[in-house]
A protein has these predicted regions:
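Vicinal oxygen chelate
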Residues: 1-4, 7-17, 34-35, 45-46, 59-130, ...
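Conserved short beta-strand elements that form part of the metal-binding/catalytic scaffold
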Residues: 31-66, 99-114
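Core segments of cupin and vicinal oxygen chelate
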Residues: 2-6, 12-53, 79
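Glutamate identity and glutamate-enriched acidic tracts
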Residues: 9, 27, 32-35, 41-42, ...
């Protein structure tokens, strides 16, 4: 008997400033909106194509109880890092491709090989009705 395969569809995180996170993940990783609870102007929760779910919690303090880090596969590592550095982020001791966001979330940027794999994977929408 073979083991059924699965994959992680999304990661949900509490964020203090949901608009900042939406803008960062859109401008750095090209992650567009898949769904929103509330409105785009005043979202309570926001899901991206690419697996992120941001849950607005303006009084959220620090990374405790959130998660270790996000590993994000990039078509163009250098371009993604350049875009990220336009935001208030800090390089981490783990390496040039590890950045800490202002609220403490750690993000590891990874170069996809081949780069085209990112677009191929993002072209699949398993939630789309048949």
């Amino acid at each position: 008997m073979s083991i059924p395969k699965a994959y992680l569809e999304h990661v949900a995180i509490w964020v203090k400033d949901i608009h900042w996170h939406i803008r960062f993940f859109r401008e750095v990783f090209g992650m567009e909106m898949r769904e929103v609870q509330g409105t785009a102007e005043e979202p309570l929760q926001y899901w991206t194509l690419g697996g992120m779910q941001f849950m607005s919690k303006p009084d959220f303090e620090g990374p405790e109880g959130r998660l270790g880090h996000l590993g994000v596969m990039c078509e163009d590592l250098d371009a993604a890092l350049a875009a990220a550095r336009r935001f208030e982020v800090e390089q981490m001791p783990q390496g040039f491709n590890w950045l800490s966001l202002p609220d403490g979330l750690a993000v590891e940027f990874i170069q996809a090989c081949p780069a085209s794999a990112v677009r191929e994977l993002l072209a699949v929408n398993a939630r789309a009705p048949e």
